[in-house]
Amino acid sequence: MPALFEWDAEKDEANRLKHGVGFREAQLAFLDPQREIAEDTGHADIERRYFCFGVVGGRVMTVRFTLRGESIRIFGAGYWRKGRRLYEERRRIHG
């Protein structure tokens, strides 16, 4: 997986105001050794989109992203119940 991150500054600010999470902080979800990556099949009309579920500050963060060349392009992040539930279910399965 690429190790460079990028994002739109205006989307970052909008996400921070709406969900209380900036994209710089969202990068930390990828550092969780037990993170889970899942394809977002519901919103992949033009390009493939993914979710990263990882623990940041003791809570499960969901990061929405796509791959652009050698970069991970973040376009959404937050602490959502559905993301936490999916992360916990996958941890039980993969253990």
Language-model-detected regions and their locations in the chain:
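Ribonuclease/tRNase effector modules and their secretory precursors
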Residues: 1-95
